Amino acid sequence: MINFSSLLRIVKSLKTTQWQILAGPILILMILSMMVLPLAPFVLDVFFTFNIALSIIILLVSMFTRHTLEFTAFPTILLFSTLLRLALNVASTRVIFLRGHTGTNSAGRVIESFGHFLVGGNFAIGIVVFIILVIINFIVITKGASRIAEVGARFILDAMPGKQMAIDADLNAGLIGEEKAKKRRIKITQEADFYGSMDGASKFVRGDAIAGILIMVINIFGGLIIGLIQHHMFLNKAVEVYTLLTIGDGLVAQIPALVISTAAGVIVTRVSSNQNVGEQMASQLFYNPQVILLSAIVLGVLGLVPGMPNIIFLVFTVLLFILSWWLYEKKYDLENDFIKSNKKYKFIHDAISEASWNDVELEDPIRIEIGYKLTPMTDINKKGDLLDRIRIVRKKVAQEIGFLPPLVRIKNNMHLSGNSYRIFIKGVEVGQGKCFYGRFMAIHSGRETESLPFEKVYEPTFGLSGYWIDEEFKNKAQKKGYSVIESSVVLSTHLNFLITNHIDDLFGRQEAQQLLERVTIDHPKLTEDLIPNTINLTIFHKILRNLLLEHVPIRDMRTILETLSEHADTQKDPNELTSIVRIALRKIIIQKLFNQNNIIEIIGLEPNLERLLLNSLKSGTDTIEPNLSENLLIQTKEAIKKQLLIGSPLVLLVRHSLRYFLSKFLRQNFPELTVLSQFEIIDVKEIKMTNIIGTS
């Protein structure tokens, strides 16, 4: 009995199969099969037609390619197309020898048509045309393309060290980021690989041209021998049939070869720009109307020479005159527009008033720049809820951290792509991403059963993979186990993450003053006794900023103020006062890191390493010896990896005297690592050392 559910599963799996992965192996198997298996004339027609279509596609792709690296698969495609032609030659030779005695249609309609129509059925003309095509392909196009690829590869390899140094210089100067530097290095490597591959791949085409001549000779003489001896044909009939079939076979293979060789020449001779080959040629050939005018005059003079085809020359002369006039008018209009715009600018410039302090734009504490397609997210009339989401983010940060972050300014940026956005904190870009208004992001949750028919993307906050899906797919994605969220939630979550990570940058003196005024309402006596009588606002701001730098909430202002009131008389150093306040806030710190766990799993320091670090501190240099510093960073990195594997918080426990020093040192490389002192965990019942950082 047929199991229909199994059949449905098979059909469904076929739909989800990525067939493009199998294209290469299928093509190779097809080529090998053609070399081994005898093919019917109709099948041979299909493959010859496919070969012609493939060559045309390759040529058009090379013409419309704007940059060489957009078609890096070309050398491999060149190899496959050459193998395909040779396999077709083998298959057609087999058919010609087996069935050639039956007539000129024995090897299929394509070969017969090329033999009859293109050369008029005259085998002498066919041989000459075939040899000319081979010479053009072998000596002119392929040899030139091969030489260009060889020289290009050599120049690119010679220039690689200089380009790498330029990238390193830009990276060190801060002109580009690590990600962009990596992309530029990959691009340089790909260019060298491409031209090196093209240098080798062009040898395939040259070999194919030589093979074409040899195959033609073998086919003619082999066909004559078979026709005369085995099939007892008359000499003139055998010459007519086998020569015609051989010429048709050679032409139907060499014309696509010539087309692909032309594509190879186009690829290696083009200069990378934002225009394709046609646009480059048109814009540069017809840029200057004077050149076209002089060409028309020369052509007109030649057309007046007796014996010349005067009408044809004069027609082209008139066409060039018209083209020259049109280009001149176009250039004149552009110059007029430029002059008018300059006059308009001068008029506006003259009308502009003198610069004043009102022209100075102060940097926004938090700014989001959005592309034009995201503007509906801010429009309440279009049901945009981004502004509400941002209000929720600010309230959430205020409730969790303990102070209200500054207002968020949203600005349209026409230079961004439509769906892009960038987030700035104090003028520095701290994050970017893409959102699609009106669509939803389906994020992998670990419970999903199958993929979705959309392009795979990564959400900008945590780098989780997912898809931007249309609204009608929302329920379907949820049923498959995906977490589906709105586009405004994606952006607001990213904003919340970045504000939390840069919270210390957002806490300025003004925020400290506002927070103090808010606390004064509930605890007036505490604030009056402490500020400015004991410590000034600058020290108070520095202490709170130190806490925020290590992601310690400052909600419990009563404890903070009482601790400062108790110790600020004898201690004025903000860093020392911060350490004292941290001990007072230890329960909040532990709860934030470990929730309500009775057992905490942390990273520890080996006693020998602690002693070496203490000696560095006592020497008064506040620096670590280079070898020790490198070893400490390596071992900390390994300890963090192990801590992540067991799913424990990234917490390092050290002596109180080392805590501030190590926290400052390790924060540069491991911002996610929290450093605690032994005085901050005195309330913990049980401590488990999961990893030890040592001296070796």
From Swiss-Prot:
Q: Where are the transmembrane segments?
A: 24-44, 45-65, 71-91, 121-141, 209-229, 247-267, 281-301, 302-322
**GO CC annotation:** plasma membrane
Q: How does it sit in the membrane?
A: Multi-pass membrane protein
User: What processes in GO biological process is this protein linked to?
Assistant: bacterial-type flagellum assembly; protein secretion
Q: Transmembrane helix as a keyword? A: yes
Keyword Lyase among record annotations: no
Tell me where it resides: Cell membrane
Keywords, alphabetical: Bacterial flagellum biogenesis, Bacterial flagellum protein export, Cell membrane, Membrane, Protein transport, Transmembrane, Transmembrane helix, Transport
Q: What is the similarity comment for this entry? A: Belongs to the FHIPEP (flagella/HR/invasion proteins export pore) family.
Give the protein's function.
Answer: Required for formation of the rod structure of the flagellar apparatus. Together with FliI and FliH, may constitute the export apparatus of flagellin.
Record-linked PANTHER family = FLAGELLAR BIOSYNTHESIS PROTEIN FLHA-RELATED, FLAGELLAR EXPORT PROTEIN, MEMBRANE FLHA SUBUNIT-RELATED
Q: What is the protein named?
A: Flagellar biosynthesis protein FlhA
Which species is this UniProt entry from? Buchnera aphidicola subsp. Acyrthosiphon pisum (strain APS)
